[in-house]
Amino acid sequence: MEMNIKFPVIDLSKLNGEERDQTMALIDDACQNWGFFELVNHGLPYDLMDNIERMTKEHYKKHMEQKFKEMLRSKGLDTLETEVEDVDWESTFYLHHLPQSNLYDIPDMSNEYRLAMKDFGKRLEILAEELLDLLCENLGLEKGYLKKVFHGTTGPTFATKLSNYPPCPKPEMIKGLRAHTDAGGLILLFQDDKVSGLQLLKDGDWVDVPPLKHSIVINLGDQLEVITNGKYKSVMHRVMTQKEGNRMSIASFYNPGSDAEISPATSLVDKDSKYPSFVFDDYMKLYAGLKFQAKEPRFEAMKNAEAAADLNPVAVVETF
């Protein structure tokens, strides 16, 4: 079921004028009630975005499309007869930016494409950190608090998932990407403005995320829900397949470092913490097997692990 409801679109340029307070309130409301919002006038160069879109689509046609078709045949998905619930209808590859880049390890990327993605990644990293400080301001946290938590000892992790969702002859049989919440911190999505498909779960109904040209869609991951003690939410989202059109998706994940210690911010805890404390890498190990399930059991499992550690401290043997 889909709802006719106004998805939050936020003009970031208004932070510099008389509408700053109103814009900050819109961001806060979106984080509390949607877990998603769409940015316009975000400062990313439109010509850079256009070039990346062109090169991503060209790269898929030249280097990925045939591999995708072979994958369909190998999994028996080229003739869909029954509903498939354990595979996604997508073609993807990943670029890692932080702590170490793999940009020059990816085969078949032109030098122009590499340089554009390097530039785009750096600009998105800056935008992500600016957004984290805006969240701090709305939450009453010290500027830089979220960035510091994400840093760990070696800095945040930052990577980009480049996806194409090709036309599907029977979209009712398979999802482009199954419903899930994102495990990490802040996700910045540059999506196709002509082919839709991204939906989020809002009050029990699936809502389309509108494809707007040159916009950046923001969504919150599980770690921000934990750090804000549930004030801000990560939400379930999915990608629907389409009979026509190849949907491009470039999602960049600004996440905590692997050894970052995640816990609810003290100032956001009234009595008891609703969420566990843990090391980010431990959560990711759990998430790997439970991605397409509800987030609550993951939080509960981490809470149980935390309680077990408190009950069974490591013994210290003193020698004299």
From Swiss-Prot:
Q: What does the entry list under GO cellular component? A: cytosol
Example GO molecular function term? Answer: 1-aminocyclopropane-1-carboxylate oxidase activity
From the record, give the transmembrane residue ranges.
none
Keyword Iron belongs to the record: yes
Reported EC number(s) for this entry are 1.14.17.4
Which reactions fall under this protein's catalytic activity?
Answer: 1-aminocyclopropane-1-carboxylate + L-ascorbate + O2 = ethene + L-dehydroascorbate + hydrogen cyanide + CO2 + 2 H2O
Q: Which residues form the Fe2OG dioxygenase domain?
A: 155-256
Q: What class of enzyme is it?
A: oxidoreductase
Q: What does a knockout show?
A: Reduced ethylene levels.
What exactly does this protein do? Enzyme involved in the ethylene biosynthesis. May promote stem elongation by maximizing the extensibility cells, possibly by activating ethylene biosynthesis, in response to very-long-chain fatty acids (VLCFAs C20:0 to C30:0).
Put simply, this protein is called 1-aminocyclopropane-1-carboxylate oxidase 3
Q: What species is given as this protein's source?
A: Arabidopsis thaliana
